[in-house]
């Protein structure tokens, strides 16, 4: 018995010793977090160490207790204007780790991809790129992507017409502006090339990148006037979620939910939104906007089998329904759906010098007529679809060279019940592309990028579009220059339209149309010194073979409309940007644009062109209850919109009709106040838009509006 007890006691001692050896020691990590500019402590910063974390107090001090010894990665989480800071340490005892966080005022350290299809710091990008970041969108209280663009890019004009909201930038309409989401093209929804930007959830935008001028060498057709690429948010935490709700005049509601996860090999993000409004006007006097109801949902999933490979899938759905005003005699209203599906995968070599990516994307637009007197039966009027497949290989043979080559195939299809002929008809277009680009560091601070694309289109044949960009950097100056070509393929509607427009006129397409060709050149200088950033750029854009619609009076006196390649246009202008942090609290941004956009066949300005335009914002970044807030006053100013045309009289004489809108400026004031408690953030937004209640016949706006919004986020 005694021997048995002794053996049991010895066994217990051995197990205890083994447990003691197996237990990982834990230590505390502490430190302070301060602002880089003011050196003031930052309360409310959440610092994580794996699954553990701690939040800074009023003195900027934090403590994370019982962190297992070994390699530890520390991360800060604060308001979006302060980027996440990361520190890796080897924890062998109680340790002090301090952080100095810099609030990002400029975007020069932002990583961009649109100008070269490769990741570059904005300051190092050879192609001049405009970036609208998440923090600018939040501080401006923007509720839509369109508002974000108007707040930051001068010269954007929205002109409602029978084909939707036509967006013009520097005299060129939607046909010449290529819209992308994460590098993939959005299908246009009408003959005007319009894209409903409300399908993009503004709360899901990480940043918006825009490059001006010809970019067909990388992106193909339509990249004539500008390329706008929306980069969506990716999950960064093990679990994150947020919810938004806002209300504005005319019973305008915007609500949204999202959740995401980022694990070792798997990531996913799902979001959904509902927007609605009672609209305004409809009495025949003044501006009018229909009541509407929108729904949208997005799902992104990614898998990383190894640190050198990844596979991603994305799905997006959007529904937009507009309603007739009270008392309307219309027996139907419009409904549209957008569906996008995509997948891509990448593989890189062990030394990261070579990487390949294959992507496939499908985007389809459905147009319905809802028959109100037939139990809201839906009649499908039109569909537009776009399928794109792309392979890209990026190779970095030396530190001075970066090479890109790729293949691309695109298939476009339109179905219409009546506009492509008297019977339901389907028309298609295909194009195959090969493209290449080489970037070379000629000297230490002198880079050159040359690229070209060859396109074979099933309708008009071949197009070759080369491009060259240069950048030279000296001290605080960056000089960029470039020349490039672009093309716009005629749309299916311009080629094959054949319909009677409610007895008022006939519209006929022209299958013999050729592609429009553009030649773009630009020079720019950028200066950055401390808290000041200024840039000046000049450009010249000449577009030939411009497709124009013209009228013919037939023998019966009826009006017939046709398309032909008869005109050309020349755009020349100057853009100026200015950003400065006057103190640790006040940030000032201003943008000015001059654009002379001439239709060379008439010598007149392009329709809706605005010669002078600008945007300005003053943002006060202060503190309430020792936590930050922002107060912004922002405005956008436009000279008159120009409407010029030549009218031919019955005797053959020609007169020039010239009309213009009033010049205008639209101002808003926005207060954004976040509250942070550990991993939780509550943010309240108050906004007064169109502060001075500007109204004008050509300007579709309900006048002064008030908005209140609230957002909750967990990370």
For the regions a language model picked out, list residue spans one by one.
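Short, acidic, small-residue-rich periplasmic hinge/interaction motif at the N-terminus
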Residues: 32-40, 46-48, 75-82, 92-138, ...
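Short acidic/polar hinge/loop motifs at secondary-structure boundaries
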Residues: 65-66, 147, 184-212
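Extracytoplasmic beta-strand/coil segments of soluble accessory domains associated
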Residues: 129, 146-184, 188
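A beta-strand signature from Gram-negative outer-membrane beta-barrel systems
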Residues: 199-240
């Amino acid at each position: 018995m005694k021997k048995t007890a002794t053996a049991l006691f010895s066994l217990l001692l051995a197990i205890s010793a083994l447990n003691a050896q197996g237990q990982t020691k834990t230590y505390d990590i502490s430190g302070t977090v301060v602002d880089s500019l003011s050196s003031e402590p930052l309360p409310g910063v959440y610092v994580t160490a794996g699954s553990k974390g701690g939040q800074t107090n009023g003195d900027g001090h934090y403590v994370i207790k019982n962190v297992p010894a070994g390699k530890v990665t520390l991360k800060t989480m604060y308001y979006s204007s302060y980027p996440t800071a990361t520190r890796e340490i080897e924890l062998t005892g109680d340790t002090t780790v301090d952080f100095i966080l810099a609030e990002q005022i400029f975007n020069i350290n932002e990583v961009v991809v649109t100008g070269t299809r490769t990741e570059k710091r904005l300051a190092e990008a050879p192609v001049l790129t405009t970036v609208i970041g998440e923090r600018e969108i939040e501080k401006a209280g923007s509720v839509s992507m369109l508002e974000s663009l108007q707040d930051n890019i001068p010269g954007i004009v929205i002109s409602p017409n029978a084909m939707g909201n036509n967006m013009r930038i520097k005299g060129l309409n939607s046909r010449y502006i290529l819209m992308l989401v994460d590098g993939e093209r959005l299908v246009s929804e009408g003959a005007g090339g319009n894209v409903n930007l409300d399908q993009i959830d503004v709360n899901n935008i990480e940043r918006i990148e825009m490059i001006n001028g010809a970019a067909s060498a990388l992106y193909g057709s339509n990249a004539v006037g500008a390329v706008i690429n929306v980069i969506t948010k990716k999950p960064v935490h093990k679990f994150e979620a947020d919810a938004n709700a806002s209300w504005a005049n005319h019973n305008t509601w915007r609500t949204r939910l999202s959740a995401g996860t980022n694990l070792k090999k798997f990531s996913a993000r799902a979001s959904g939104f509902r927007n609605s409004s009672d609209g305004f006007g409809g009495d025949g006097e003044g501006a009018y906007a229909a009541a509407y109801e929108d729904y949208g949902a997005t799902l992104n999933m990614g898998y990383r089998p190894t640190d050198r490979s990844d596979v991603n899938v994305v799905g997006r759905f959007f529904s937009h329904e507009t309603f007739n005003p009270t008392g309307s005699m219309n027996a139907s209203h419009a409904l549209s759906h957008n569906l996008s599906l995509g997948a891509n995968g990448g593989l890189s070599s062990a030394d990261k010098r070579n990487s390949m990516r294959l992507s496939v994307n499908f985007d389809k637009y459905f147009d319905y007529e809802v028959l109100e007197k037939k139990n809201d039966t839906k009649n499908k009027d039109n569909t537009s679809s776009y399928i794109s497949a792309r392979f890209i290989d990026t190779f970095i043979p030396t530190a001075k060279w970066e090479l890109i080559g790729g293949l691309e195939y695109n298939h476009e299809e339109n179905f219409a019940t009546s506009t492509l002929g008297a019977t339901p008809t389907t028309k298609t277009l295909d194009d195959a592309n090969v493209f290449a680009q080489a970037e070379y560091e000629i000297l230490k601070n002198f880079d050159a990028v040359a690229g070209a694309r060859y396109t074979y289109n099933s309708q008009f044949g071949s197009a070759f579009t080369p491009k060259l960009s240069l950048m030279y950097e000296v001290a605080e100056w960056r000089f960029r220059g470039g020349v490039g070509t672009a093309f716009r393929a005629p749309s299916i509607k311009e080629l094959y339209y054949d319909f009677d427009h409610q007895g008022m006129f006939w519209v006929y397409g022209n299958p013999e149309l050729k592609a429009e060709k553009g030649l773009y050149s630009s020079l720019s200088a950028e200066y950055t010194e401390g808290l000041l950033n200024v840039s000046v750029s000049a450009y010249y854009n000449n577009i030939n073979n411009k497709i124009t619609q013209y009228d013919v009076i037939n023998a019966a006196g009826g009006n017939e409309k046709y398309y032909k390649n008869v005109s050309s246009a020349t755009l020349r202008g100057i853009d100026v940007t200015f950003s400065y942090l006057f103190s640790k609290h006040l940030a000032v941004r201003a943008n000015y644009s001059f654009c002379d956009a001439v239709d060379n066949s008439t010598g007149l300005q392009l329709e809706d062109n605005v010669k002078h335009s600008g945007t300005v914002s003053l943002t006060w970044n202060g503190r309430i209850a020792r936590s930050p807030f922002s107060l912004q006053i922002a405005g956008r100013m436009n000279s008159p919109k120009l409407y010029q045309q030549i009218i031919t009289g019955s005797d053959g004489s020609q007169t020039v009709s010239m009309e213009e809108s009033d010049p205008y400026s639209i101002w808003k004031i926005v207060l954004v106040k976040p509250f942070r408690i550990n991993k939780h953030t509550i943010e309240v937004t108050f906004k007064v838009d169109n502060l001075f209640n500007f109204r004008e016949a050509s300007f579709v706006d309900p006048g002064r509006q008030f908005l209140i919004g609230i957002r909750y986020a967990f990370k």
